[in-house]
UniProtKB/Swiss-Prot annotation:
This is Tigger transposable element-derived protein 2. Residues 67-139 form the HTH CENPB-type domain. Belongs to the tigger transposable element derived protein family. PANTHER family: TIGGER TRANSPOSABLE ELEMENT-DERIVED PROTEIN 2, TRANSPOSON. Residues 28-48, 100-132 bind DNA. The keyword Transmembrane does not apply. It comes from Mus musculus (Mouse). The keyword DNA-binding applies. It is found in: Nucleus. Keywords: DNA-binding, Nucleus. Residues 168-385 form the DDE-1 domain. Pfam families: CENP-B_N, DDE_1, HTH_Tnp_Tc5. Coiled coil: none annotated. Residues 1-52 form the HTH psq-type domain.
Length: 525
């Protein structure tokens, strides 16, 4: 007589493996024998495939699915979703999170969401919350979530062994990371901005987008910037073919990239672009992508190419500031280029601050952010990988700080602008480095108003010139030229065979026309 089969309790990771094997064509019987479970259990796993995957997506990818066995959800699912998003954001920013802080924040969200019920943010609730999302016990005890040097060192060693074992070259190793960009954040203090405090607080949730930078360790392959906004199709996109944008655009409501968006980007953008690049280099179409820890990311098992040759590896918790390549100055430099571009765009157009701010659209921001990412040099990227690959830099003795050079160049331009002579590099660095968590945007001091006055003084047309313009043989107004340029830009956005450089030229012409129109309006006052 056969003995009773021992009861086997599968982890979430085991169930994900079974789902993957089923998709590969393995039979129910084969898997039941392999895992020591009944065929009916395998069928149940297939039936609950979507629920299992969704649960795995909301768990800590480094430990949540490997240890967790049940999928019991929270009584207050909306609160649970908001809390894990908040927790991830605090962890990314290196902000201390204790059990008391978690409890208070949960209570705040419960009330803010207008939820009903007898909710008590007790220690029991906190324990269950951490278990549901695979959050390590050490997290939430009040220690600052900063770089864990021991974990970073251990990961570096293991990763280098993995690279050698898989025979991967730096060309085949990629890194990606995301950051929030307050795209309407302008320098504020004195002059025009100081007269109305409401204009100083330019940063609102509607004016924030997420950008994700991705490149390989050599810096030779930078994927198009990934941009995530709240609106599926912003008004500024009217008439624009999204496939013609210089970035890959997604929409969602959350503050950080959701699992579904990341999975879609990985499958539709990352994998095919990497395969194409490696093929052009005559290399095996095999690669690995390093991603940060956030628990909202899909499990590693869910992110791989169909042939399993392009995979994802997650960094351990709390090592982003130490070894995440894109966090070693790359994202910061992109933001600096973006902000410097805003100032240059403002000075080129010659509008007053409020008009410039009002006219600035998310489409403008996307082009400016794309330009900023394109300006990042390959040696800046290779230098960012030096902790994972100490010998990866071509010329390690030559270190170029793009951010410092950018600040110095902008300071030189402004110091040669009337009434901005006192602006120094420290002022610019302060604005460049202002964090999204601050109460207001940092300042450059008197830049915008002085720039207006300098341009009006320099370019204000004479009375004779204005008189000659009244009766020209054929006069085209700035307004008409601007309308035609806008229409032509809309046309180009709808075409799938236009070069980005062509569109950038027209956008530059539009900036010049706007500036001329502004100067003319001022001259008639």
């Amino acid at each position: 007589m056969l003995g009773k089969r021992k009861r086997v309790v599968l982890t979430i990771k085991d169930k994900l493996d079974i789902i993957k094997k089923l998709e590969e064509g393995n039979s129910f019987k084969k898997l039941s024998v392999l895992y020591g479970i009944g065929e009916s259990t395998v069928r149940d796993i297939k039936k609950n495939k979507e629920r299992i995957i969704n649960y795995a997506n909301s768990s800590d990818p480094t430990s949540g699915v490997s240890k967790r066995k049940s999928m019991k959800s929270s009584t207050y699912e909306e609160l649970d979703r908001v809390m894990i998003e908040w927790f991830n954001q605090q962890k990314t920013d290196g902000i201390p999170v204790s059990g008391t802080i978690c409890a208070k924040q949960a209570r705040f969200f419960f009330d803010a969401l207008g939820m009903e019920g007898d909710f008590n943010a007790s220690s029991g609730w906190l324990t269950r919350f951490k278990q549901r999302h695979g959050i390590p016990k050490a997290a939430g005890k009040g220690t600052k979530l900063k770089g864990d040097e021991t974990a970073a060192s251990e990961f570096c060693g293991n990763f280098q062994e993995f690279v050698e074992r898989e025979n991967l070259l730096p060309e085949q190793i990629y890194g990606a990371d995301q950051t929030g960009l307050f795209w309407k954040c302008l320098p504020t203090r004195t002059l025009a901005f100081d007269t109305d405090q409401s204009t100083c607080e330019y940063r609102t949730s509607r004016e924030r987008i997420i950008i994700m930078c991705c490149a390989n360790a050599t810096g030779s392959h930078k994927l198009n910037l990934c941009v995530v906004g709240k609106a599926k199709r912003p008004r500024a996109f009217k008439g624009t073919d999204l496939s013609n944008l210089p970035v890959t655009y997604f929409s969602q409501k959350s503050a950080w990239i959701e699992p579904s968006v990341l999975k879609q980007w990985f499958e539709k953008c990352f994998v095919p672009q990497v395969q194409k690049h490696l093929k052009s280099k005559g290399l095996r179409e095999k690669a690995v992508l390093l991603l940060d820890f956030p628990a909202a990311h899909p499990a590693e098992e869910l992110l791989s190419s169909d042939d399993g040759r392009i995979i994802v590896k997650y960094l351990p918790p709390n090592v982003t500031s130490l070894i995440q390549p894109m966090s070693q100055g790359v994202l910061t430099t992109v933001k600096r280029y973006y902000r410097a571009g805003l100032i240059q765009k403002y000075m080129d157009e010659g509008n007053d601050p409020k008009t410039f701010w009002k006219n600035l659209t998310v489409l403008d921001a996307i082009y400016e952010a794309s330009r900023a990412w394109n300006q990042i040099r390959s040696n800046t990227i290779t230098r960012a990988w030096k902790k994972l690959f100490p010998g990866n830099e071509e010329n390690p003795s030559v270190s170029i700080d793009e951010g410092a050079i950018l600040a110095a160049n902008l300071a030189t331009v402004l110091q040669n602008t009337e009434d901005c002579e006192h602006v120094n590099i420290e002022n610019i660095e302060q604005w460049f480095d202002s964090r999204s968590s601050g109460s207001n945007c940092q300042v450059l001091a008197d830049i915008v108003g002085a720039a207006d006055r300098a341009k009006v003084t320099e370019q204000k047309p004479s009375r004779k010139t204005r008189k000659a313009e009244l009766n020209p043989e054929k006069h085209i107004s700035h307004k008409a030229a601007l309308e035609w340029t806008e229409n032509l830009l809309d046309y180009l956005e709808q075409q799938d065979d236009m070069l980005l450089s062509d569109k950038l030229v027209l956008r530059r012409l539009r900036t010049i026309i706007r500036r001329k129109q502004r100067i003319q309006n001022k001259s008639h006052l």
